[in-house]
């Protein structure tokens, strides 16, 4: 209903606000200060004294959606990881980034959609990580143009790939093998998410499920096109295909298996 729409719009506006700080800030310390201001604003929001228009828009939903303050802080922490633009040494740090960048939003969204079974939160957590890994794989070339590498350095090492290879689109056979491993990791998270979504919450969680299915099909398309020059061709799905996935998901089709 209308309440859910308003809550989602406010949550989306919050994500845009903090995301724009990272995208627009040329100077790290200015960005950090702005993110710190948002940390304070979240404290005010949960003390019923919001000042920022976006926080004011979130305010009526704090209690009704049972929002957890820590998830908002974790989203900001994820943005700060992005702002520092450092590399992620290992899979543990990489997964932490994915959790903050996507699972925290997913958990807040799951609260908006509504659930009766706690397992739904495990589904939202794993789906968030799956979506973020898919995003990272799809955007490797685009990110490298901005000097960003999200792939854990331990994986680059495992496949004998240098940062320079990623930044300048070299050593493609090895990169294809690495992408293969990352797609398998994402696929595992999609499957784990679906396995943890209880039947009784499938209806209310449908918006997230549709998104999960669209990204899962995108991941499969990436796997099919991963032949060695993956960094050259950014994979996407047509609007028609997305619509078809959305409709069939609503009718109960299982895409993730």
Label for each model-derived stretch:
Residues 1-132, 137, 141-257:
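Catalytic cores of Mg2+-dependent Asp-rich isoprenoid enzymes
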């Amino acid at each position: 209903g209308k309440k859910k729409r308003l809550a989602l719009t406010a949550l989306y506006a919050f994500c845009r606000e903090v995301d724009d700080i990272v995208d627009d800030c040329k100077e790290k310390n200015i960005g950090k200060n702005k993110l710190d201001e948002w940390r304070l604003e979240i404290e005010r929001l949960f003390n019923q004294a919001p000042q920022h228009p976006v926080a004011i828009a979130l305010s009526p939903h704090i209690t009704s959606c049972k929002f957890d303050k820590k998830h908002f802080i974790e989203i900001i922490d994820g943005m700060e990881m992005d702002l520092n633009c450092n590399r992620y040494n290992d899979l543990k740090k990489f997964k932490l980034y994915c959790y903050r960048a996507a699972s925290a939003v997913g958990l807040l969204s799951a609260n908006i959609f509504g659930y009766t079974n706690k397992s739904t939160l495990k589904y939202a957590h794993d789906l968030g990580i799956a979506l973020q890994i898919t995003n990272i794989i799809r955007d490797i070339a685009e990110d490298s143009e901005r000097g960003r590498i999200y792939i854990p350095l331990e994986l680059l090492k495992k496949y004998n790939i240098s940062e320079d290879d990623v930044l300048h689109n070299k050593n493609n056979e090895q990169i294809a093998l690495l992408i293969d491993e990352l797609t398998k990791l994402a696929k595992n998270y999609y499957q784990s998410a679906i396995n943890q979504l209880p039947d009784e919450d499938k209806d209310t969680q449908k918006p997230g499920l549709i998104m999960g299915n669209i990204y899962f099909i995108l991941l499969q398309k990436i796997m099919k096109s991963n032949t060695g020059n993956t960094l050259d061709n950014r994979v996407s799905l047509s609007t028609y295909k997305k619509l078809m996935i959305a409709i069939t998901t609503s009718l109960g089709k299982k895409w993730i298996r």
